[in-house]
Amino acid sequence: MEEILRDSRNAVEKYHDPSPYSMNMVALAPCSPFSASEELYRQSAILARDLGVRLHTRLCETLDEENYVLTKYGKRPLAYMESMNWIGNDVWYAHGIHFQDEELRLLAETGTGVAHCPISNMKLSSGICRIPDMLKLGVPVGLAVDGSASNDGSNLLEELRVAFLLHRLNSSITNIK
């Protein structure tokens, strides 16, 4: 873990450009609650805030992840992350499919963001992220492509198109008169 944190610090110090609209911003991003230790998450949060960079990880992507965190830590994934100070306007989570209502309100209240990856979520049958609900509550939402293992092209314009069509279809179900 010390090597990861040292390398992270070095990467931020060497490459991070905090100026507005910079295309060279570094974030600290342990992969997911089932592949990174609790201590790495805690120390990453401390380091990121010390260096003034953002935090990113996957969260609430699958029901398997939710069950893993509940079993191992006795908490829902967002409560687990909050216990390690992974909440706030410097944090964003990829996916966010399985957040409950009260968790969406917490995300909105704290300015914690969600990166929507609809193509990956469709390919893996993970579920549909509640983007319309998030936007109504004021959760910061971005659009992203996932890694190459679950996204065939890393095409952000295609991701935009699919997000539009997916949520148009999904919202039409509740708007039938």
Segments predicted by a language model, with ranges:
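Domain-wide signal for the mature, well-folded portions of proteins, strongly enriched
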Residues: 5-18, 26, 110, 127-129, ...
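His/Asp/Glu-enriched, well-ordered alpha-helical/loop segment
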Residues: 83-90, 132-177
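Histidine/acidic-residue-rich catalytic or RNA/ligand-binding cores of hydrolases
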Residues: 63-75, 103-108, 125-134, 151-168
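Metal-coordinating catalytic core of metallo-dependent amide/deamination hydrolases
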Residues: 1-97
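Short, acidic/turn-prone active-site loops that include or flank metal/cofactor-
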Residues: 61, 118-122, 147-149
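Glycine-enriched alpha-helix->loop->beta-strand junction motifs that scaffold or abut catalytic
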Residues: 45-54, 86-89, 106-115, 136-141
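Divalent metal-coordination and catalytic microenvironments
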Residues: 28, 58, 93, 107, ...
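Catalytic beta/alpha-barrel core
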Residues: 90-100, 117-123
